[in-house]
Amino acid sequence: MSSKQEPVVLGKLGSSHGIKGWLKITTYTDSVEGIFDYSPWLIKEQGEWREVKVLQWRFQGKAVVACLEGVETREHAQMLTNCEIAVTPEQMDTLPEDEFYWRDLIGCEVMNTKGYNMGKVQEIVETGSNDVLLVKANAKDGFGKAERMIPFVTEQFIIEVNLTEKQITVDWDPDF
């Protein structure tokens, strides 16, 4: 793998399907078929990432199955069950200036406009109307908060996202 950055996990290999080495695919992409927009894949096998190419894929009932280059038997496919599927960060689409990948926001320090350190983004929750940052407060939080939930609404609550500095500036009362 040429990238020094960690691979971006997009799914995992499921159980074998049939006797010719096909595997069920679990995808974390927005659309089920979105994972097949990327090639080659990286799979983590015995702690090491290696490149694989998808030769074919198809819907099989409610599942999606794929045939990977070099995997020709059920036994070989079974050995790959539960391996993560990833791509290099360079393979990911470049987003518009005001959009971000969740993976880039996780771990960012969150400061309000008055300079109060609210904590770090631990997780992002999709609510339907907008995403919500789950911010783990610092151990010595002056407001006694363990965590905060801040709607990711740009210009209203999210003032600035600086990925270089890993910092998000918010217009948010630390007592919420």
Swiss-Prot record:
GO terms for cellular component: cytoplasm; ribosome. InterPro entries: PRC_barrel-like_sf, PRC_RimM, RimM, RimM_N, RimM_N_sf, Transl_B-barrel_sf. GO terms for biological process: ribosomal small subunit biogenesis; rRNA processing. Keywords: Chaperone, Cytoplasm, Ribosome biogenesis, rRNA processing. SUPFAM superfamilies: PRC-barrel domain, Translation proteins. GO terms for molecular function: ribosome binding. It comes from the Bacteria. It is found in: Cytoplasm. Residues 97-176 form the PRC barrel domain. Belongs to the RimM family. Binds ribosomal protein uS19. The PRC barrel domain binds ribosomal protein uS19. An accessory protein needed during the final step in the assembly of 30S ribosomal subunit, possibly for assembly of the head region. Essential for efficient processing of 16S rRNA. May be needed both before and after RbfA during the maturation of 16S rRNA. It has affinity for free ribosomal 30S subunits but not for 70S ribosomes. This is Ribosome maturation factor RimM. It comes from Shewanella sediminis (strain HAW-EB3). The gene is rimM.
